[in-house]
UniProtKB/Swiss-Prot annotation:
Keywords from the UniProt entry: Heme, Iron, Metal-binding, Monooxygenase, Oxidoreductase
Oxidoreductase recorded as keyword: yes
Protein name (record): Putative cytochrome P450 126
Gene name of this polypeptide: cyp126
InterPro entries per UniProt: Cyt_P450, Cyt_P450_B, Cyt_P450_CS, Cyt_P450_sf
């Protein structure tokens, strides 16, 4: 099995390598020297298990499009961060850790609660909330864009979609805040909870909310999913545990990844003021700009799968049961697919990025994320013509989320 010499000193499970954002310089070496190679376990690998690391676009796409060979059951999110190598007892119960046929049945059910009509219905509310947040920005005064806007807007929208009562949202933001690694919120009016306490409170709250949606359904996504039936004689409806995992997944996938795209997008525009001015002068470019922001930020940069059978990938022999980690964050900078891959270009077209995934696990909330990005940047750039980064961005120390924890900026008109 290939263990590239040039990569032997690089540990992709050492989160220090991700402390300043996604390490594109390391993955450039990875793509060039060994697109698919065996990553030996290290002291930073929690389960002590090696894995196949995949850095190039073609091979990443091959894995994502073949869910039979590359199983998701032991992949997906990890409750306490960690690395892309940990298995969880909930594997197979949450949507992004399911295989077919149940995955397709559950996905169809969830999709019924996230229709284009429902997304269009929230646009006016989304714009009103975006304007309200921007009203609080004093031109020329430094503020933390992540805490005040990028984290705030997606969380509010997820609460609307799930039917969380307005009176509960303030409490809920504070309860889940530790799990999303937000710090310094202006809403910090209660003692910080540790991650375990936050998870426990969220679980209790979610079950009570689910029970209420079953008893008195409303016009929201959680009501649709909680009362729907599945074409599965062994499990015709979602259990409370599955509904909680769905609730939690929407918070993490719907709030955190959109937060990361918004914050990373503003940073990219600040670092490329010519692109900011081009976009500000022509909002018709917003659709391509949004796709470039998602490619550039790659907010969910890695996925882990397990080979269900022996297979060859990129010329390397993978055995059944071995782990395979694909890095969309690297694939989205593959120069064999993207011209000037390391340049931020809001006019880039075509832009076949993998920022929303691919195949059967393509992001269900992609259109909602696009809407949030479009509305926020449209409103922001209508008011402000320049962005100055006051302090270096503080990144999350993670190889599964490319996120900015704090971004202190000044916004000015003109």
């Amino acid at each position: 099995m290939t263990t590239a010499a040039g990569l032997s000193g690089i540990d992709l499970t050492d989160l220090d390598n991700f402390a300043d954002g996604f390490p594109h310089h390391l993955f450039a070496i990875h793509r060039r020297e060994a697109p698919v190679y065996w990553h030996r376990p290290t002291e930073h690998t929690p389960d002590g298990e090696g894995f196949w690391s995949v850095a190039t676009y073609a091979e990443t796409l091959e894995v994502l499009r073949d869910p039979v060979t590359y199983s998701s059951v032991t992949g997906g999110q990890r409750r306490f961060g960690g690395t892309v190598l940990q298995d969880l007892p909930v594997a197979g119960q949450v949507l992004n850790m399911m295989d077919d046929p149940r995955h397709t049945r559950i996905r169809r059910l969830v999709s019924s609660g996230l229709t284009p009509r429902m997304i269009r219905r929230v646009e006016d509310d989304l714009r009103r909330r975006a304007r309200g947040l921007l009203d609080g920005v004093e031109p020329g005064a430094p503020f933390d864009f992540v805490v005040e806007i990028a984290a705030e807007l997606p969380m509010q929208m997820i609460c609307i979609l799930l039917g969380v009562p307005e009176t509960d949202r303030h409490w809920l933001f504070e309860a889940v805040e530790p799990g999303f690694d937000f710090r310094g919120s202006r809403r910090a009016t209660m003692p910080r909870l540790n991650v375990e306490d936050a998870g426990s409170r969220l679980y209790t709250y979610a079950l009570e909310l689910i029970a209420g949606k079953r008893a008195e359904p409303a016009d929201d996504m959680l009501s649709v999913v909680a009362n729907a039936t599945i074409d599965d004689p062994d499990a015709p409806a979602l259990s409370d545990a599955e509904l909680y995992l769905f609730f939690h997944l929407l918070f993490s996938a719907g709030a955190e990844t959109t937060r990361n795209s918004i914050a990373g997008g503003l940073l990219a525009l600040a670092e490329n003021p010519d692109q900011l001015q081009t976009l500000r002068s022509d909002f018709e470019l917003l659709p391509t700009a949004i796709e470039e922001i998602v490619r550039w930020t790659s907010p969910s940069p890695s996925k882990r799968r397990t080979a269900s059978r022996a297979v060859s990938l990129g010329g390397q022999p993978i055995e059944a049961g071995q782990k395979v980690v694909v890095w969309e964050g690297s694939a989205n900078r593959d120069p064999s697919v993207f011209d000037r891959a390391d340049e931020f270009d809001i006019t880039r077209k075509p832009n076949p990025h993998l920022g929303f995934g691919q195949g059967v696990h393509y992001c269900l909330g992609a259109n909602l994320a696009r809407l949030e990005l479009r509305v926020l940047f449209e409103e922001l750039l209508s008011r402000f013509g320049s962005v100055r980064v006051v302090e270096p961005a503080e990144w999350t120390r993670s190889n599964r989320h490319t996120g900015i924890r704090h971004l202190v900026v000044e916004l000015r008109g003109g």
